[in-house]
Amino acid sequence: KNLPLIEEYNMKVAIENHCDLWSDEVIWMIEQIDHPLVGACLDTMNAQNMMEGIASCIDKMAPYTYCCHFCDTKIIVDPDGVHSYGCTLGEGSIDLIRVMNTLRREAPPELDTIDLEIEMPLSMYTLEVGREEEIKAMRKSIQYLHDVLDVGIRGR
């Protein structure tokens, strides 16, 4: 029903593996729609939160990925249970080198957006301290993307 509209504007649509959607479900929808402007939005944190297995999710979704929410997470076990929260790239539990290598090897040319997301547990900070921590994490993450994953423009 909406395909003519996305065709009119030549607008890509990426279906995300969100916190309630497995990679197989995303792929099924994309294959049912079967349109070159419809692909996947791969979220590395959601793959972990769904306990799907990050490597398996990346391998399945990479060939369909038009957009990636590139995140890292820390797993914390405490008396209240098991929790995950976003952190600076390279400081968490996700093998981001493998993720980037898989995307470089398997993703279609339509992959044109890698969105850096850091979902920090800001409730433990004041607003001012939380902003400072977010900026610090973002700067370190950009440095990680540049130095470790070879993302970005050289010489900057």
Protein language model features and the residues they cover:
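Histidine-acidic metal/acid-base catalytic patches
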Residues: S23-L37, C41-L42, Q48-R156
